[in-house]
């Protein structure tokens, strides 16, 4: 049957046209509706939001045992697909399989999930060294829930792929990843400027948690960042429609998600308020990185991971053998199965000094270096832990002590997957100021250069372990020697250069400073204190040589606090780069404050 369109009356032709357009619009709307969250990233990094982690009924029971063989077109040689479109489709398929696996092993925490892991009143907890009994006294988990957790955990560890396919990262690529969006785009850019200032050539990806974040900062992503060899990565675009449909992510999951969506194979993950003060580029070429594939840094506190987690994860801990003091190893002959013989000795030994446990100290995740190829399963399992963080794993990893959050999920995942990591041995150096009551207020954490820390550790600690005199000494004598290392060579005042300064409280934000009556001098339009004291770091500066001579390198001392304010002045007041974070601010007033601060710090830097 044929239709002669010329014979159709004009009014009917118009009706057909309108109907056709309407049908097309309905089709487009139905097939492009991805439910995403307009994320409130204002809470990122400050606290987590105790909310429902999953809003996803897509529990179809599908299991992705190991998607790599069918997803990776290169059959394992790490090359990406021939076209961007095919590569993205392949990556989306992989991530759908991963999240289907997460859904299959969804933790059921009962009708009262917030109390599935129930903290015990501190007055009722056992006191003393953090041995097994003391740790177990801090929280209660029912035997029924323990059985459920063990089954689900065993299943997800079994079903997650051992490696990620080449379609989800660019083979051989190295770079820095920072989370942006809202105020964190401002902080991320300040961190980017500092990174370039210390000489780093690494590309940078700033992760936008939602498409709304990206669209609000289109100018920032498309024009400002490329000038600094940086770009935006939009999280839902990388994961794909099938993953994002009906699924919501919370702020405490963004750090693990950033590792997932970055295109880099070799990753330095930075909190947006973390300032690099030592060029990180050489780390990816180092023996340390190639040996371990993952580098972490310590937090202030000792590990309080519950022995129950070791049961859930089926990690065997030898309760009769002490193998370390704090984060420093002790010598034990290879054939010695036990060196703890009495109940009194057992009570005196911290649980995390035992063979099979995770070594001290707890981990501070403001910076993390990791290889996406060798440690892909660690990243995936850490993401799983963060899905059930606030009500489950954060509690099992902290037991109500300070520092609860995502920080220990990465090391725990590495131990479960049996993938190596090196944790820096040097203790955090705290920077701050004395307030009007002469009370010290900490504002930032200084972490040490991992390469020099490792060299220091090899030259002092590991070298001592090779000496026959040390091998023949008692455990008690060995501990005394390790205490000296702890208090002298690796304490917060050691000589190992800084790597980062984590400016987490308060953050480097002039808008925030002006709202703080305890910090801001309204009359003088400047801060009342030098917040970072006399913090200086060493920077190498290349000097042009005279005619016929080679350029030389000088080492200069940089006033950290003054430099950050100079960066703010350049970004906001001279270049006038736009940030949505300051949309409601009078920029003239803000820049007057910044100008006053630069002038005041310049006079007081000596």
Curated annotation (Swiss-Prot):
It holds the Pfam family Mannosyl_trans3. It comes from the Eukaryota. It is an enzyme of class 2 (transferase). Residues 36-606 are extracellular. Residues 62-78 have a biased composition (Basic and acidic residues). Residues 59-86 are annotated as: Disordered. It is a single-pass type II membrane protein. This is Alpha-1,2-mannosyltransferase MNN23.
